[in-house]
């Protein structure tokens, strides 16, 4: 069972040894960070500063969402002890984590508190992504 906490600009979702932070980062911008560390880094990894914006959070047992403008990100428990992360634009599903057991995400420890993360997503056939990721 997950533990979900509301923050100043989103939610923190904890399940087993993973910590997922979903934040409204500006109008129509949602930032998601995932770690196996006990806390999230305060390091500024993004190119943009956080913008003040209106957003909504909704938390129920085993499920939470953050909405900023036309975007919504939702995370929910799955029966086998994993979670599904979904993204919506104008209430229409555009992307979600692949639903095939808990091995759709892989964490490789690199050094110190750093991990390389690989996550499998199911996207729509007409969806294209450019410039994702940071190394």
Where are these regions (language model features)?
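N-terminal accessory segment at the very beginning of proteins
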Residues: 1-135
